[in-house]
Amino acid sequence: MSGNTFGRIFRLTTYGESHGPGLGGVVDGCPAGVPLDESVIQRELDLRRPGSASAGLAGTARKEPDTVRLLSGVFEGVTTGTPIGFHIANEDQRSRDYGDLAKLYRPGHADITYDAKYGLRDFRGGGRASGRETVSRVAGGAVALALLAMHDIEVRAYTVEIGGVPADVVDPAGAQGRLFFSPDPDVVPAWESLVHDVRAEGDTLGGIVQVEATGVPAGLGEPVFDKLDALLAHAMMSVGAVKAVEVGAGLEAARLRGSENNDPIIPGGFHTNHAGGILGGISNGQPIVVRATVKPIPSIAQEQITIDTNGRPAPLRVGGRHDICAIPRVVPVLKAMAALVLADSLLLQRRMG
């Protein structure tokens, strides 16, 4: 399997499966002198962790501590410039829950495509295709966030919609301490009620996550094929559940006239930010704004129609422990992916002068 490394200068390579001994990765290309220790990475992992407070009733019953162990690349609290290795053990996997799936393909999952490509698949939770894989992204993204902080660049992410119920973005700064990473305290009860009802129906929910980066200098991004917005879209779409990405006004731009969509240029910046902080694939100094649409988790507690590995029709009811709504755990993942892109682009710009 190829495609396990992300980035050009600041590179993250990940390994591990949902029901293997553990997951981890190596960050290569991080400069020396970045303040970093296990607590810095752990803080981000705790935001994504199964059973975290942000997920509430929406989360999986699988309770992984997600304790990170740094293996290399850090000495006396700073990076050394050498590869940064880390490992996170799987401690609460229950592979016996998946025995019935050995000969059945789960609708909405990558079972059938992995089988088509490799001639085999890990039916214990999906292996590399599991959302569990994203724990390594969050750990690698924490290193990127530490580097960006040295340059006064901040990345944050929050939920703007669950199950078709939108939030008003009134307090994005407080979203991290709120259920569902909501920027709107008033919408939380409606989301809780929706999750409760959908759980009772044996179904799942999707939603939309917004990622913002402030302090990004003008000039990041490499036309023509490595535009900053193209790289961010690549990063977001590489997350298994993401099905669409918008930048700035996004889909709404199709409904605007040019006179409405253009951001007037004024002394010191721009009057509006429909461009989402990127023009011509290059950052313009405005906040970067990206939204990702996340599909409902396909593991549902309802009977579904599928086929077995011999192509015969078969009913399926998925067991195991799964999220009702993965949005709260996707939020830190998308934040991490944006950080990886920005750290890589920043280092590339510095190298090119």
Swiss-Prot record:
Binding positions for FMN per the UniProt entry: 128-130, 280, 295-299, 321
Do you know which PROSITE patterns this protein is assigned to? CHORISMATE_SYNTHASE_1, CHORISMATE_SYNTHASE_2
Which EC main class describes this enzyme? lyase
User: Pfam families recorded for this chain?
Assistant: Chorismate_synt
Q: Which residues bind NADP(+)?
A: 48
The annotated pathway is: Metabolic intermediate biosynthesis; chorismate biosynthesis; chorismate from D-erythrose 4-phosphate and phosphoenolpyruvate: step 7/7
Region forming the signal peptide: none
Please list the cofactors this protein needs: FMNH2
In its keyword annotation, does this UniProt entry include Glycoprotein? no
Origin: domain of life: Bacteria
Q: Offer a single GO CC term for the protein.
A: cytosol
Q: What family does this chain come from, according to its entry?
A: Belongs to the chorismate synthase family.
The UniProt subunit note reads as follows: Homotetramer.
Protein name as it appears in the record: Chorismate synthase
Q: Which organism is it from?
A: Nitratidesulfovibrio vulgaris (strain DSM 19637 / Miyazaki F) (Desulfovibrio vulgaris)
Lineage of the organism = Bacteria, Pseudomonadati, Thermodesulfobacteriota, Desulfovibrionia, Desulfovibrionales
